[in-house]
Amino acid sequence: MIAKKIIGFIGITRLDKPIGIYLLLWPALIALFISTEASIYYSFLIIVIVGSILVRSTGCVINDIFDMEFDKKVERTKDRPLASGQLSKQEAYFIFLLLSLSCLFLVSDLERQPQLVCLFFAFLIVFYPLTKRFLKIPQVFLGVTFGASIPIVFSMNGKLFDTSMWVLYLANFCWIIAYDSFYAMSDYDDCLLYTSPSPRDRY
């Protein structure tokens, strides 16, 4: 039973699929390198690395909670811990709460501005799964949300409104839309069964 729950925890947080962490971490490390002019504070580096893992996992959990019924009907997602019954919804909420509190603790010693930026993007992360219900192109909202690490890192170094931040954020925004649109195509046949029109059709 315990082993089953551990496997479920790993599955719902996607720790067994670290590519999502890399996609969040790489832009954050670039932002850290630019905003500090290569004079990186090790405390900030730890926050960026640990934060990328926690935030990605938190986003995956809340996404699975909101999409549980849809996931049951999609070939690619039907075996996810919530959709398959490996974890209960109450257990998923507990994991989400635990990860959220860990994120809060991680940024508790930061200045006021980066804390507010973190709070703003936290709301977007929670809201993102719901956008797939009413936005024709939710990839755009994901592009805004998943690039959170860039303004957060720049604000940590007091450079939130630096031009280089906006350039990097925009480039990352386009990159996210590109790879997530390609990713969404894998569910195209299932989307035709349960939604109309599909996001890909809008492109």
Residue ranges and their predicted role:
Residues 28-44, 154-158:
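Alpha-helical phosphate/pyrophosphate-handling elements in metalloenzyme active cores
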Residues 38-66, 100-103, 115-124, 161-182:
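Membrane-embedded alpha-helical segments that form the functional core of polytopic membrane enzymes
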Residues 1-7:
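Transit-peptide-like, low-complexity N-terminal presequences
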